[in-house]
Amino acid sequence: CSAHEPCHEHEKQVEFDIAPAGVISYETALPVVFEQLKKAAKDPFEVIARTMSVNPSRTIKIDNAIKEGNEANLFAFDPDREWVHSIDEARSNAKNSPYEGNKMKGKVLLTFAAGKKVFAE
């Protein structure tokens, strides 16, 4: 497994040094980053927007600005929403998460990609 593809569980159930790299983090990345930035940054939302959206868009030369004529690529995030991460409820085919059973704060509630709603809680 590579290129951000999920690994089968049996591929991860081996010694650490021979297991394929990576863990699922699609649903946990933003809450984890937000919690850390709340402690370290004056404006955590600005840092997240810049480092997880604006800069990557520039790197791959995509105009991802929210403006008339552009397709929506955005999400709604509730920074106060508390939830417990469960790999059984995760939307990934992979089943390896270091956050299994952890109480999380902050949750993505809605996502649009290329102008289409692709996720809604």
Can you name each region flagged by the protein language model?
Residues 15, 68-121:
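C-terminal cap of metal-dependent C-N hydrolases
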Residues 2-79:
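His/Asp/Glu-enriched, well-ordered alpha-helical/loop segment
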